[in-house]
């Protein structure tokens, strides 16, 4: 039997209250986190086992925007993406995500897959 995952849909710093989003409540398995940056500044997603932005951090993804848009030694890069395979990490209270852009805004986002 195949596993069926649910997705948070695209999350950005504009999602929820300033990038703070309750993705799921109650016991769930965290399968993966995907993120991308196409332009702008670096971006970060912090995922908590909770229903708020506190408690146990189960993942922290930071995608650096250096070398994008022809800046830096590798001028051909037009975007970056990253995936964390979380292998079904058990989140007892739920999944809460906080997305931030430390130095401004840009074209970026995250998705969280869970079951």
Question: Model-derived features: where do they sit?
Answer:
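C-terminal interaction-tip segments
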Residues: 1-27, 99-115
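Local beta-strand/beta-hairpin segments that build beta-sheet-rich folds
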Residues: 8, 22-25, 54-74
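Noncatalytic modules at the cell exterior or secretory-pathway interfaces
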Residues: 31-33, 88-102
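Short, surface-exposed beta-strand/strand-loop-strand elements in extracellular ectodomains
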Residues: 40-61, 109
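Beta-strand-rich, repetitive solenoid scaffolds
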Residues: 47-48, 60-64, 85, 98-100, ...
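Exposed aromatic-hydrophobic patches
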Residues: 79-87
């Amino acid at each position: 039997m195949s596993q069926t995952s649910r997705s948070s849909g695209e999350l950005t710093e504009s999602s929820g209250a300033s990038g703070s989003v309750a993705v799921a409540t109650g016991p769930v398995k965290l399968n993966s986190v995907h993120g991308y940056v196409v332009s702008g500044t670096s971006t970060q997603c912090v995922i908590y086992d909770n229903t708020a932005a506190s408690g146990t951090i189960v993942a922290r993804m930071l995608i650096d925007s250096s070398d994008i848009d022809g800046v830096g030694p590798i001028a051909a890069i037009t975007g970056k993406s990253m995936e964390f395979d979380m292998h079904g990490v058990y989140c007892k209270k739920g999944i809460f995500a906080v997305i931030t852009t430390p130095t401004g805004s840009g074209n970026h986002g995250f998705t969280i897959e869970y079951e």
